Amino acid sequence: MNETNDIDQLIYLFSKLPGLGSRSARRIVLYLLQDKDVRLKSLINNLINIDKKIVKCEICGNMDTENICRICSSEYRDKSVIAIVETVAELWAMERSGNFKGLYHVLGYNLSAASRKNPSMLRLPELLTRCFAANIKEVIIATNSTLEGQTTAYFITEYLKEHPAKISRLASGIPIGGELDYLDEGTLSAAINLRQPFE
């Protein structure tokens, strides 16, 4: 089947999305093109809308329509507890569990020699400033259970030693090598409830 370069380019772009290969990308493109006046235009309009409206929260790093996200500005959140997550995907996963009512701090990365991510790329100075300014009582390290996530967790623990907050880690239930975004809500809820002091 010969496809135009524009279609090939669209298939290529979709195939770069997480979890999609070239076959799935081709199916998506065909689905969109079969009713492009409705499906494709709706997708385009939504993407343009998101591009214009979505910003990174100035406090935690979440993505929202406001400079200070709904979580950080909520009066119903426990402002004495911060969960440190690697990316917004993990923040959203914890929110889906419905079990965590504190605040978040998105690092943006984990420490990884392979991908050349180093401590200076993490948002740790901002975290320490938040901990002191908001009188944080507990910091929950909610990094993934991968080697990089564990390394990042240990580094954060050392970094926060000068702050008196209790430092805890999500409990078992998260498999070694597992990523929060792929866990079901029940497993993540149990991990939040059974979190343990970080040693």
Curated annotation (Swiss-Prot):
Residues 80-175 form the Toprim domain. The keyword Metal-binding applies. The keyword Cell membrane does not apply. It comes from the Bacteria. A zinc finger (C4-type) spans 57-72. InterPro entries: DNA_Rcmb_RecR, Rcmb_RecR, Rcmb_RecR_Znf, TOPRIM_dom, TOPRIM_RecR. Keywords: DNA damage, DNA recombination, DNA repair, Metal-binding, Zinc, Zinc-finger. SMART domains: TOPRIM. May play a role in DNA repair. It seems to be involved in an RecBC-independent recombinational process of DNA repair. It may act with RecF and RecO. Belongs to the RecR family. This is Recombination protein RecR. It comes from Rickettsia canadensis (strain McKiel).
